[in-house]
Each structure stands twice: as C-alpha cells, then as structure tokens.
Amino acid sequence: CIYPKLAPQPLKEDYLLTGELEPTNEPYAIAKIAGIKLCDAYRSQYGCNFISVMPTNLYGIHDNFHDQNSHVIPALIQRIHSAKISDQKQVEIWGTGQAKREFLYVDDMASACIHVMNAPFAQYQQMTVTQPHLNIGTGEEVTIQELAQLICEVVEYHGELIFNDQKPDGTPRKVLDISRLHRLGWQHQISLKKGLAQTYSWYLNHQGRLRTV
C-alpha cells in the first residue's frame, strides 16, 4: 500500500513517492513511509545500520480471523470452513475473483528479515541506493478465484463459489518486484498451498482461542 495507486506492476522499490497514493489507504501508507524515511534519516545522521523492508500481503498462524475485519486469507478460511461444517451449498465472495494478489507466509517473512539482517550491510546499501528499503515477497501472483479454490481444497469444501461482481475488486493487480532481494540471495520456501494448509491446521487447533479483533 506504500506505492502509488497507478504505479506500474510489478512494484519496484524505486516507485516509492512517484505518484498519488490510494486514497482509502493513504493514512496507513503515509505512516509506513514515514517509518522507512525515519530509519533512513537515523542511518544517515547517526550511522545506525537500520534496515527497512516492505512485505507483500502476509498470512499464516496467529492471524486475525474476525468474520468482518480480517484480511482476505483468514476471512476466506473462516467463511469456507463455516460453510463446510454447516453444510452450506454456496459461498459468496465479493468481486469478480479476477483481481490478482501476492501472498507470503509469515515464516518466510521472518526468514527473509533474518537473511537481510545477516547479510553484509554494504550489500544492503548497494541494493538501496535509490530507495532505502527492500521489497519482500514471492514474486508470484494468484487471482482471488484461484486462492478461494485452493482454500476449498485445503478445507475439503465441495460447495460452489459465487462471485458477486456487484461488489468491488479493489486494485486489479498488486505484486512486488523482489529482484533485489533475490540478488541478495533469498528465496521463499513455502508454497501458497502448503502455507494455507498450515494456517488451516492451526485455525482448527485453536478454536475458541482465535484473535478476532
């Protein structure tokens, strides 16, 4: 969300502050950008080896599974699981299902952060000459329809998915360029289907103790 609304895809680090932000996310984006710039200023002024990274959409264990306020993956897991146990024949999903998104499992996020912190700081500086942060993601995109179908496979739900095209899709495509991170020697390890399976298993084992705020 820190990148301009109309920035080219995939989103390169260099696109930061090159255009107007998405209005609905602007305060959130400005807060993140301020954090990146503050770390950069401390690094310049005081010589602190601060590192800034910008992740793509994260998911995994300990996520927020609130039925109204959660992000797309926990929301779909909760909704499709509920449909399965209540024997609902259909699940409605907002939008056409054709919007494309990128998702990173939380353990891969932690792995990437550790990798970047352990890399020689001179390498990080070489990668961040034009902008003081690195993107973290998979570089792989999936449509919301494909995501929902994967979750149905993991949950073993055999009903029908109904896409309500009267509801908004949001940004048609959102994927990060992670070529700099790859040049630094890091690759994600957890496939989307494996990550979804681990997340659903955790969800099942923590009924009654889920974060729902």
What are these regions (language model features)?
Residues 10-14, 69-71, 110, 152-154:
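Glycine-rich, phosphate-binding/catalytic loops in enzymes
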Residues 24-28, 56-70, 95-108, 138-140:
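Glycine-rich "substrate-gating" loop/helix at the edge of Rossmann-like oxidoreductase active sites
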Residues 82-213:
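C-terminal substrate-binding subdomain of Rossmann-fold SDR/epimerase-dehydratase oxidoreductases
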